[in-house]
Amino acid sequence: MNTILLGNLIKIRWIAITGQFTAIFFAALILNIKIPIVETFIVVLLSVIINFYSYFEERKNKTISNIKAFSYLLFDTLQLGILLFLTGGIINPFSILILAPVITSASYLPATLTVILSLISILIIISLNFYYIPLDLGTEFYLPQI
């Protein structure tokens, strides 16, 4: 049983949610990148709902089992995988963040669960190399004359 983990997961997820909303709106409104705003908003909003549930769960019970902690980190991994699918796949500069739940898992959970989460992350990364919605940057790519 991990006594601190749920509170830490809640804090980490709030940071991730803030970063995700900021990146989505910055890309769409400032950089004029055409991304599926409604779909990405729904995916991040689901994370907000899960985090509120976790917050009220923590108020009732400070301890959390390894399996429950793993399920939270698995959700975070899948949620980020869906966001990356919607926003350009593996070429998205934020794709490296798929490692964050694995690193958190390595810090708190047994090696077996960390290996399982690592394998799932690897499968997501490989899938994102082939299946994703390409970003429409609104401009043609060209090389300047030298």
State each model region's role.
Residues 1-5:
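Short, Lys/Arg-rich, polar N-terminal cytosolic tail immediately upstream
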Residues 47-51, 103-106, 125:
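Alpha-helical transmembrane segments of multi-pass membrane proteins
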Residues 44-49, 74-78, 93-101, 146:
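Membrane-embedded alpha-helical segments of multi-pass membrane proteins
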Residues 47-62:
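Canonical alpha-helical transmembrane segments
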Residues 17-21, 74-80:
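Core segments of transmembrane alpha-helices
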Residues 6, 18, 22-44, 60-69, ...:
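Alpha-helical transmembrane segments and their interfaces in multipass membrane proteins
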Residues 79-90, 96-116:
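Generic transmembrane alpha-helix motif of multi-pass integral membrane proteins
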